[in-house]
Amino acid sequence: MELLVKINKKLEQRRAILNTIIQNVGIQNRILKSAQILAECLKLGGKIITAGNGGSASQSEHFSSEMMGRLKNSRTPFPSLSLSSNASLLTCIGNDFGFERIFSRQIEGIGTTKDVFIAFTTSCKSRNIIEALNVCKNSNIKSIPVGGINLS
């Protein structure tokens, strides 16, 4: 029974988050703006670049996989790649330039002004994510941070 209580508590927490989003026009507008940025990127022939650390790396890879795969409907694949996927490249850059540069260095190499960078993060404090967002800003590459935000 104790496990069921824990499960219900987690479900209630998720419901509270969804209710906050439903009731907050500001959050809804940020979601809409993100969708518009992604649509414009694809319309212009850009690609969606994603990255994250730990579990967020898995989210990054999953998102990019769904963009290249089917998601819900058969369609032309949307150009997308996860910067978290290549262990050889991550360790090469980490060794040569420092772990904080593992994503920004890749963006410098492949990013264009048509692209969008999605940073999956729970804390919004990881140095490598911050560095990547700074490179995007300085290179006029649009970016969307996902997660780790205060919903109020």
Name the predicted role of every residue range.
Residues 48-49, 143:
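Hydrophobic beta-strand scaffold residues
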Residues 3, 26-30, 56, 137:
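Residue-level recognition of alpha-helical structural elements
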Residues 23-44:
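A short, well-structured juxtamembrane/interface segment
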Residues 56, 61-152:
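Glycine-rich phosphate-binding loops that contact phosphosugars or nucleotide phosphates
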Residues 1-26:
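Generic N-terminal amphipathic, Lys/Arg-enriched alpha-helix
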